[in-house]
Amino acid sequence: MKLVHILFVKKKSNLNSFTTVFEISLNTKYKNLFLLGNIFRQFLLGSFEGLVINEKRFYVSHTNSLYKDFYLVNEFSLLEEVLEPFYDVWTVFDNLRFKEKFSLSKRYYARLLTYGSGEINSKDIIVPSNLSLLENKSLFTLITDSLCIDVILQILSKNGSPFNGVERVNYILENSNSGNINYNKLYLDISTRYFLSPMEALFECFRKTNLALSKM
């Protein structure tokens, strides 16, 4: 795209989210700004991908048993050795988010293996070299050394705002003149969760929608 100008009009942030209003000035080649705004909005809310845990399997073994056999448990299991209710532990894993350093696959696997008692954090998860966790948070606490937990995680790339970190996208259209050049302005209001900045989302939108823009 040529003759594209992006300005920050407004920025706001808190502990859990970011909001930025961008002023995007385009040359007159792109006459249908309503369609352009829709392309951006639909991509950010529906097609922009994010990495999430698709499947998780928890295996436990009692270290004081004669044979160290692991058996499968679910979110409704009662484990006295874990301080938190196991259903809450299950939910914490669901909320973990990952980021690719470079794209290799649509599916990845990660593992968490506990040794001894104490607090277990997301930084203890072993992930592929091209993935990183977006935050370190407490997962659960083992109150004894008698239980070993082995967690296998399947991580998938999924489309849509529940997974990619985009919370809200709105846009306003405006026409203006500057000298002999007619500019069309698109104001794009993007709100994202703490692990994704609106600027990152916008740049990814420009990169992925280039084919759609070239046909306008």
UniProtKB/Swiss-Prot annotation:
It is found in: Plastid, Chloroplast. InterPro entries: RBP11-like, RNApol_insert_sf. Signal peptide: none annotated. Keywords: Chloroplast, DNA-directed RNA polymerase, Nucleotidyltransferase, Plastid, Transcription, Transferase. The keyword ATP-binding does not apply. Transmembrane segments: none annotated. Its EC number is 2.7.7.6. GO terms for cellular component: chloroplast; DNA-directed RNA polymerase complex; mitochondrion. GO terms for biological process: DNA-templated transcription. It catalyses: RNA(n) + a ribonucleoside 5'-triphosphate = RNA(n+1) + diphosphate. Its main location: plastid. The keyword Plastid applies. Belongs to the RNA polymerase alpha chain family. This is DNA-directed RNA polymerase subunit alpha.
